[in-house]
From Swiss-Prot:
Keywords: Cell membrane, Disulfide bond, G-protein coupled receptor, Glycoprotein, Membrane, Receptor, Transducer, Transmembrane, Transmembrane helix. The keyword Transmembrane applies. SUPFAM superfamilies: Family A G protein-coupled receptor-like. The lineage of its organism: Eukaryota, Metazoa, Chordata, Craniata, Vertebrata. Belongs to the G-protein coupled receptor 1 family. Residues 57-74, 135-157, 271-298, 359-412 are cytoplasmic. This is Motilin receptor. It comes from Homo sapiens (Human). The keyword Glycoprotein applies. Glycans are attached at N6, N192. PROSITE patterns: G_PROTEIN_RECEP_F1_1, G_PROTEIN_RECEP_F1_2. It is found in: Cell membrane.
Amino acid sequence: MGSPWNGSDGPEGAREPPWPALPPCDERRCSPFPLGALVPVTAVCLCLFVVGVSGNVVTVMLIGRYRDMRTTTNLYLGSMAVSDLLILLGLPFDLYRLWRSRPWVFGPLLCRLSLYVGEGCTYATLLHMTALSVERYLAICRPLRARVLVTRRRVRALIAVLWAVALLSAGPFLFLVGVEQDPGISVVPGLNGTARIASSPLASSPPLWLSRAPPPSPPSGPETAEAAALFSRECRPSPAQLGALRVMLWVTTAYFFLPFLCLSILYGLIGRELWSSRRPLRGPAASGRERGHRQTVRVLLVVVLAFIICWLPFHVGRIIYINTEDSRMMYFSQYFNIVALQLFYLSASINPILYNLISKKYRAAAFKLLLARKSRPRGFHRSRDTAGEVAGDTGGDTVGYTETSANVKTMG
């Protein structure tokens, strides 16, 4: 297979690429990674896709179907499950790019949407976690204020605002990427109405962070020059938008680290409040409320820690990716990012597993939903206060619920 890196039809002749030669593209594969890396990564990602989609669908169905589960905290978690589902929908496109960075066959719209939806849902998840942590802080450290501020209607409105802010913040990504033809391949009109492939000298020195895939090889066989040029089309940032893309990637990084700082402060204050309140409580209602608070914080802390562990490498990899020009660091960045990609999709798949492991109420509701039992699982009784809210969950203590030690139940 020919390659613009070693072609001799350019006006300046062939020049060596700025990093070691990569295997050429063919009809089956166009990737800088060997099969020994692609196969296990693909297997892991497909497992995450199946587990994540099924788990998040169950979470959304539980919160939508059972009124006991429709609480302020669980409304956030249900919205986060929708965000995770949308993130997981981008996994097949990332797998396609791992195996075949070019040609991109899904059109410019899906090229733009695959990045935009992933970024927008990432922002939405971060904003949801921050808002949920603020609610928990108010419920535990400022309970009187929480009784006034936190209601289901306001939480639903806030969730809509969070989604709007997230999607608007990610809006520039719609214009920063597109289906680009490799600069090293162009169709040049020839004599007698013929056409030929021309190799541009610009192909020898593209920005290293723009495209890590191997140089394209035109399809073998009697394809035309136009078909060979089409083979080089790739979903990637536009060269004219590289500066703006760098800015947006730093915005994305700030979107991660600023909420992380906020979460650290909030959970530090919550932990101090819960620790200082570890004293004998009067009556079963106070004892049940305290256990509900602790269970809620325990679940949310596990979710937040899993989120940080899974997403931190992703953002560190991006920082390395957009700042390195050294070929050895480039190879390190490639393999670091392929691991970070798996952790990124793990974060979108793991929350339902955590809910199932930690929350008895979630397990009971999921068991009832999946087996379609007619009888209500144990503990699924309701009590209402004057506002008509359902008591007994992680969010119930924020709106003036009447709780007892028997009906304090948590989902997460």
